[in-house]
Amino acid sequence: MVSVEEIRKAQRAEGPATVMAIGTATPPNCVDQSTYPDYYFRITNSEHMTELKEKFKRMCDKSMIKKRYMYLNEEILKENPSVCAYMAPSLDARQDMVVVEVPKLGKEAATKAIKEWGQPKSKITHLIFCTTSGVDMPGADYQLTKLLGLRPSVKRYMMYQQGCFAGGTVLRLAKDLAENNKGARVLVVCSEITAVTFRGPTDTHLDSLVGQALFGDGAAAVIVGSDPLPVEKPLFQLVWTAQTILPDSEGAIDGHLREVGLTFHLLKDVPGLISKNIEKALVEAFQPLGISDYNSIFWIAHPGGPAILDQVEAKLGLKPEKMEATRHVLSEYGNMSSACVLFILDQMRKKSIENGLGTTGEGLDWGVLFGFGPGLTVETVVLRSVTL
């Protein structure tokens, strides 16, 4: 007779979860940030709001974003005028778009990750799908399973409406799945399309306008598994994870799904709240490893906006190059919500290889990945790089 203990031992992986492959995708429509204010005020029939347009121009100039990718192009917006208004009932039109497009963009990223992984997709045992864009049943996880031709028995997890911290959440969940299920290979997909949040300008809610200056579309996918086979090539180990709600941060970042789409609200002091509490999160994560110099680790931080990165750097005395990969992704893609940190992970390993830096983490062994979002919720992931 086999004991429960023996069964449990046999079910668990030996080693830590590893990221084995990364893929990213964006819609084809690329938007230049320098000309975006003119386009945005024209397409939303708001050109009479000249002062607000100047304010929006300044927001775009300060955003440190060069370009973004958006599914919503001029043609689609002209066909859907309700999406261009500030507060017109438009949820049906938005839902009709994202329910189809979110899994499609996710498929593009997933296909690239599976190709890099190099194993048959029939070996994928679990799927985690995450999006803040739209809600449906059966969900985007089901649609992606069908689009990719995954096994019907794949174990699916659908995460809707999490927000910008969720790139950390999916890695935390994937780590637990991979380490507690021997032989598990988890496909993680974050796919975000701003068709739910796009709306015309108003001078009564400037936080909505901040979102219009920052958000972009993108999807990223990773394969996570423990005990890699010789044919699999791990990129990063997922060593430790945590999630916490910051003190005194209620209402700092909110999103509400309404007839008018997903509305976005934020308090001015989001950068202050994050920078004030970041050291506590780092001590909890790195003290057990004997690390207290945060310039000695590599950094992947969700680029909610330039002010967050600036204040975190200042608070911790980080060298400018620490946030290089993070700022590069912000500059080239904007804030893609949950997908951002996975784009940064991809950027970091690519640059590390290009520059011959010795490890996937800019030549360093240990690193941190931070997700920040509604709550104010912070996800922390401790990463260990792999020798190149």
From Swiss-Prot:
Domain of life (superkingdom): Eukaryota
An MF annotation (GO) of this entry: naringenin-chalcone synthase activity
This enzyme's EC code(s): 2.3.1.74
Active site per UniProt: C164
Pathway of action: Secondary metabolite biosynthesis; flavonoid biosynthesis
GO BP of this protein: flavonoid biosynthetic process; polyketide biosynthetic process
UniProt xrefs under InterPro entries: Chalcone/stilbene_synt_C (IPR012328), Chalcone/stilbene_synt_N (IPR001099), Chalcone/stilbene_synthase_AS (IPR018088), Polyketide_synthase_type-III (IPR011141), Thiolase-like (IPR016039)
This protein's UniProt keywords: Acyltransferase, Flavonoid biosynthesis, Transferase
SS bonds (residue pairs): none
Reactions catalysed according to its record: (E)-4-coumaroyl-CoA + 3 malonyl-CoA + 3 H(+) = 2',4,4',6'-tetrahydroxychalcone + 3 CO2 + 4 CoA
Gene3D superfamilies per UniProt: 3.40.47.10
Enzyme class: transferase
Function as written in the Swiss-Prot or TrEMBL entry: The primary product of this enzyme is 4,2',4',6'-tetrahydroxychalcone (also termed naringenin-chalcone or chalcone) which can under specific conditions spontaneously isomerize into naringenin.
Record family assignment: Belongs to the thiolase-like superfamily. Chalcone/stilbene synthases family.
Name the UniProt record assigns to this protein: Chalcone synthase 1
Native source species: Glycine max (Soybean)
GN (gene name): CHS1
